[in-house]
Amino acid sequence: RSRGLGDVYKRQSIKEERVMMEQNNLKIITNPIVNQSLCTMRNKNTDTEGVRLAARKLTRILLYEATKNLPQKDIEIETPLTKFKTKTINPDITIIISPILRAGLIFTDEAVDILPQATIRHIGMYRDEKTLKPVWYYNKVPMPVDNPENYYVYITDPMLATGNSLIEAIRLYVDKGIPETNICCV
């Protein structure tokens, strides 16, 4: 029996699934809205406005999940009726949204709506077609950073191919002393 492309993809998918199951820092989000948004974004017949709307929905869901471990602070606020004890994102931390140019920009507007206190730090790389290695051409990440343990970074890049650009982006922040546990790829 000859093997078709479907068999190759199936084997590769099973292998990738095993690798993903071994990762304890990988979160796969599955729900109907995520699936519908991905379907809309991938459909060649979707117009630009449709892609943007689907990306906004997807960004919101992904960031809600990605930010659930941000440090919080207990505060007391005054409501129209009484005082109320609650929690808020710790104002002593620095949140960075770091889109990898250009594809990562599609997540930026929604990310800033969700995290208005975040700073945007663009990073730009392209893939050398011969070596498949990333080549830097733009970096707006400050050097050095004070109190790197108080930084929380969300790297946005929907166009994952080899993963080398994402690895380089993570390395950029780790080299500044930011703990890997404080870096999330969306």
Where do the language-model regions lie?
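Single conserved hydrophobic/aromatic residue that forms the stacking wall/gate
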Residues: 1-12
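PRPP-associated nucleotide enzymes
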Residues: 14-186
